[in-house]
Every structure is written in C-alpha cells, then in structure tokens.
Amino acid sequence: MTLAEIAEYANVSIGTVDRVIHNRKGVSEKTKAQILAIIDKYGYKPNVIASQLKSNKAFVIGVLLPYLETGDDYYRALYEGMSQAVAQLSPIKIELKLVTFDRQISGDAIKKSSVFFDGDENAIDALITTPVVQDEIMEIVSKLDGKPFVYIDTPLGTTQPLLTVVQNPYKGGYCAGRIMRMFQGGGKFACITMYSSGYNLRERVRGFTDYIQKDAGSVVLDEICTDITELGFYKFMKDLFERHNDIKGIFVPHAEVSLATYYLVDQGLNSRVTVVGYDLVEKNRQGLLDGSIDCLIGQRPEQQGSEAVHKLYQACMLHQHVPSRIDMPIDIYFKENII
C-alpha cells in the first residue's frame, strides 16, 4: 500500500502515517499501533516517483567493468542488461555511470574507479561490479562508506555485498567435464585460460578437472596463454600441440573460445579435438554453427545485469528485502539448439 492508501484505510492524515513510518513524535500509541498493523498486513510501498519529483535527483549507480569489448563483448552484454533494466523502470530516475578498466594492467581498476569518489558531482548511490581483480575490488568497495554494492559474474566471499548474481563456477566446470567425456570418453585434455587470476576461472577449471579425473587414466593440462592476440594464441596452440599431440579436447572457461579454434581449423584438427567453452557471444555462436566449437555453457549476462539494477531499486528505493544471492542457470548450447 502507498502512504495515501494507508492513511485512507486508517482514517488518518498522510502526515500522521509519515510520522509513524519515520518514527517521529506526535502520534498516539493507539493510532501508531493501528497504522503499524496495517503496514504489517498489507505492506508499504513508497511513492518513489513522487519522492524523486520532489527532490529532482536521480539514483546514480556506478558500474565498474573490464573494457566492454573484452571477453568478445561478454561485458558489453552485462552492461546492456543493466541499461534495459533502467529503461524498464522508467519513469523512475536511475542513472548508470559507467567506468571501464583493463583487467591485465595492475592497479587500473583502482585508478579508473577514483572518479566515483571525486567530490559530490560524481558521487554514486550504489555500485555494480565484477571482482575479476579481487584485491583491487576489495579496496574499492571499502571506500563506499556503507553504500550498497552488487557483484555480478564473479563472487567475492570476503566482502559483504547487498547481492551477488552469479552462476556457480565449480558446477559449470564440472558440467563441462561431463560434456567432454560424453564426446571423447577418457584421454588427455587441456584447460586453456587467458588470465592468470580470477576466482571464477580457477573454479571452472577445478570442476572440469575433478570430473575428467574420475577416470583414473585421464589427464588434464592446466595451461595459461597471456598473449591474447590471434597470432599470439595461434603460436601458443601450435606449441601446445607440438608438446602434446594426443590432446583429445580443449576447455576454455571464459568467452574467448573462438581464439582456440583458429589453430585447430587451420591444421585440420577440429574434427578430432572437441572444444567446449563458455558464453554465447556472437563469435562463439558462429563457432557453434560452423562446427569449430562443439558446446558452450551460457550464464545469461544480460539477465545478470538486469537483476542487479532491479534488486538495487527494490532495496534502496522501495526498501524491500532482497536475497543475498541469485544463482544463474547453467545453460548448455549445441549447434542444434541455438536460434
């Protein structure tokens, strides 16, 4: 119920209800108890639009993400989900203040995020981020001075966000291992990542390895390629297969799966080497269609971004309880089930 509806139901003035809600003096105990009983039974929904019109102030959400084009546009999909949520909540005035950083440059997230703390003009009311560089994100959220923050894509258990919107990374990797075994049975497999750190990535690799190594005769190579150019990755794959020409499958636990396929296609290996990876970004979608990628695990980035904005709105503007975690499903894509 709105403030006006509660007042009408209780046969009192709006001002009286407002005093009770904000625990101010000037209301008899009998009237206060009556109003609180109505709120307890029917709930209270603030008139956010009226409040914003009165204050003429938008609710500003800082968004801190790796460069949107990295991850083959995976991070762009996260941000697009947030933008869609803002549009859906119109005419509520919510503003996204986007800051992006290079996750491969140490300290860049801290440096770029300083704009959020640079005086009242750039102040934010809440923050949405992905803790892909954990130590830096921990330092950044410690500066928020009690303002709410939400994690998407990657959890970080040593802090206390309002909400975490993620897929379980270990289960995702475990599922990838099960799929790989369905294609290839046992043998030698390689997990290839392009980043030396990242909780999500390590957990996916761990899950994949645990499933594959249920077969005592199977081996999983844990490989990192830090040169993420097409040429650099091609050379890395060439060296890997010269050292291990009996690899039967490749698992890439992040969105840049297509980079792993160039060498395989060029050398005619894609017919015998299974490729399982993450995220239905456009390049990977095309890889499924042309057969260079066998299976993808999706984690609904647009929905993650949308949930983050909607839950901040509910918690901060409607003062409603929101869950501390939302788990994204493990979506599995083959060539035959994408549109």
Residue locations for each model-derived region?
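Hydrophobic alpha-helical segments within soluble ligand-binding/sensing domains
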Residues: T164-K188, F233-Y234, N284, R300-M317
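Flexible loop/hinge segments that line or gate small-molecule binding clefts
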Residues: V132-K171, V281-L289
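N-terminal helix-turn-helix DNA-binding module of bacterial transcription factors
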Residues: M1-S55
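Hinge/cleft segment of the Venus flytrap/periplasmic-binding protein
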Residues: I38, Y211-I212, R300-I339
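Amphipathic helical "hinge" segments at domain boundaries
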Residues: P46-D108
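Hinge/beta->alpha junction and helix N-cap segments in small-molecule ligand-binding domains
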Residues: Y67-Y74, K97-A109, V165-G172, C191-Q213, ...
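Conserved beta-strand elements of the Class I
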Residues: G62, K188-I192
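Hydrophobic alpha-helical
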Residues: I124-D145, F208, T226-K283
